[in-house]
């Protein structure tokens, strides 16, 4: 084996390559993700220590009044352990995993990616980065449609650091809506929602920002920011009955719009 080929491969030139192909591009939390990791040998035989997959995103942290973005691993697992790949040889490793229920929806500034790490012994590791589209879980989709029917439009969505929630991940995804028509346009400035999904149902955290109305409203907003925070849990049956769901959401908003 050429000394220079060895040297080049250790520097990543002519080394094995990795490419991960997913069965499809879009998934929703709780759905099974299937795909295959393709590895092709380079110009020399190489020992592969392992192949790992990570599901990752970025979230906002505020430090010294400045916003920064930090990576977070949503899920990770080992696809395979050690093996040797010969020059030009091809290997395929199928995999399956369930998209975690707390995976953020890819809307607004939120991105989610499957990152493949090919660990090469004595060489530079290779990686593959595949963005995926994460759709809303059907229960959350029903809530979003109901909120839209009540006259709200999604203005912004992002993942923000939230250690006080004591969740598995260091962040929560926040959805910011603005009223565009109807009663709430006169009563509210904005509505922020956080969805905490599990197998049995959905907890929604509402942050309602009331519009200041006259001197009393202005003074109230000055002292407590005009915001009201409420947590409500919905069962599976409540989330699947779209008419009842919209009525319940309207009742909640009416309490805090007055």
Curated annotation (Swiss-Prot):
Domain of life, source organism: Bacteria
Q: Does the keyword Kinase apply?
A: no
Question: Keywords on this record?
Answer: Sporulation
Q: Which InterPro entries match?
A: Arrestin-like_C, Ig_E-set, Spore_0_M
> Which positions, given as ranges, span the membrane?
none
Entry keyword annotation includes Thylakoid: no
Q: What induces it?
A: Expression controlled by a sigma-H-regulated promoter which needs the sigma-H factor for the binding of the RNA polymerase and subsequent transcription.
- A single BP term in Gene Ontology: sporulation resulting in formation of a cellular spore
- Describe the task this protein carries out: Controls the expression of spo0A and is required to pass the morphological stage 0 of sporulation.
The protein, known as: Sporulation-control protein spo0M
């Amino acid at each position: 084996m050429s000394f220079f080929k060895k040297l080049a491969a250790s520097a990543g030139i002519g080394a094995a390559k990795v490419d991960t192909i997913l069965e499809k591009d879009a998934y929703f939390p709780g759905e099974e993700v299937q795909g295959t990791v393709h590895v092709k040998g380079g110009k020399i035989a190489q020992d592969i220590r392992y192949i790992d997959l990570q599901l990752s995103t970025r979230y906002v942290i505020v430090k010294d009044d400045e916003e920064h973005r930090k990576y977070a691993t949503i899920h990770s697992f080992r696809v395979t352990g050690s093996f040797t790949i010969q020059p030009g040889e091809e290997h395929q490793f199928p995999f399956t995993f369930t998209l975690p229920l707390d995976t953020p929806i890819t809307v607004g500034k939120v991105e989610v990616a499957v990152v493949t790490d090919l660990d090469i012994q004595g060489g530079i590791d290779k990686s593959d980065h595949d963005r995926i589209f994460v759709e809303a879980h059907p229960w959350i989709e029903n809530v979003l449609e109901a909120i839209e029917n009540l006259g709200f439009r999604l203005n912004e969505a992002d993942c923000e650091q939230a250690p006080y929630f004591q969740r598995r991940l260091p962040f929560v995804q926040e959805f910011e809506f603005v009223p565009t028509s109807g009663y709430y346009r006169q009563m509210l400035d904005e509505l922020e929602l956080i969805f905490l999904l599990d197998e049995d149902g959905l907890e929604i955290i509402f942050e309602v920002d009331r519009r200041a109305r006259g001197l009393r409203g202005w003074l109230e907003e000055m002292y407590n920011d005009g915001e009201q925070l409420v947590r409500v849990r919905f069962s599976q049956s409540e989330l699947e009955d779209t008419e009842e769901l919209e009525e319940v959401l309207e009742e909640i908003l009416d309490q805090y719009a007055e």
